[in-house]
């Protein structure tokens, strides 16, 4: 997912891979609702906070959301394999917020895991610093009378989930069009923000 909503599959460049190798990467397994796939997050050592935020969003925020938001993705979970690898990066050279990795383009980690388990493993990547700065509804956010730090935390959590679900839908339903998938993830973002702003800040989200 790009800021302008153009989706591409991207393989990190040589320099980015070399830098990640020098820094090292860590893995974390996330469990959520019983019908939701496990997420195996692979992240750079300086991405610990982003990995923890994704874990909280996927394992706690998403399952606790109201039925209207969750129903947008009712058909998603049965169409995905039991494990989805999520490669976290600060940013992508192409500017995309995330990519889905079609069969044959997975990382060595995902291929090795699929071989060891004996069944399919899906993979996506998320550019967490780019997602942090992404604000798809700036006027609605500005209309909430809250401290900037409070709104930034909520926006980041909602945006992480929206981009995650966007790329997972591309994996599960490769024939669905980008406008259809984008429309659903934007609607999810709006509903997620409305819920979180109401519950955590006691305010209304959006422009009256």
Which role does the model predict for each range below?
Residues 175-208:
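Post-HExxH zinc-binding segment in Zn-dependent metallohydrolases
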Residues 154-162:
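Alpha-helical scaffolds flanking conserved acidic
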Residues 162-174:
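Active-site recognition of the HExxH zinc-binding catalytic motif
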Residues 125, 169, 184:
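Functionally constrained cores in energy, signaling, and assembly domains
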Residues 1-153:
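A metal-dependent hydrolase signature that marks the N-terminal structural subdomain at the beginning
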């Amino acid at each position: 997912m790009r800021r302008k909503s153009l989706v591409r599959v991207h393989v990190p460049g040589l320099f980015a891979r070399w830098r990640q190798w020098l820094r090292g990467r860590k893995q974390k397994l996330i469990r959520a609702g019983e019908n939701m796939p496990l997420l195996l997050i692979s992240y750079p050592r300086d991405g610990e906070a982003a990995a923890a935020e994704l874990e909280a969003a996927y394992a706690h925020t998403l399952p606790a959301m109201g039925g209207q938001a969750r129903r947008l993705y009712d058909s998603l979970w049965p169409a995905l394999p039991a494990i989805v690898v999520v490669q976290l990066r600060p940013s992508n050279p192409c500017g995309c917020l995330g990519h889905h990795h079609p069969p044959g383009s997975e990382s060595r980690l995902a291929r090795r895991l699929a071989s060891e388990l004996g069944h399919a493993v899906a993979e996506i990547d998320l550019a967490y610093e780019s997602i942090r700065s992404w604000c798809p509804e700036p006027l609605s956010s500005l209309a909430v009378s809250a401290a900037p730090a409070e709104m930034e935390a909520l926006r980041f959590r909602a945006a992480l989930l929206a981009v995650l679900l966007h790329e997972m839908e591309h994996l599960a339903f490769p024939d669905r069009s980008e406008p259809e998938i984008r429309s659903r993830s934007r609607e999810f973002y709006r509903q997620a923000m409305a819920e979180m702003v109401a519950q955590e800040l006691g305010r209304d989200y959006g422009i009256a």
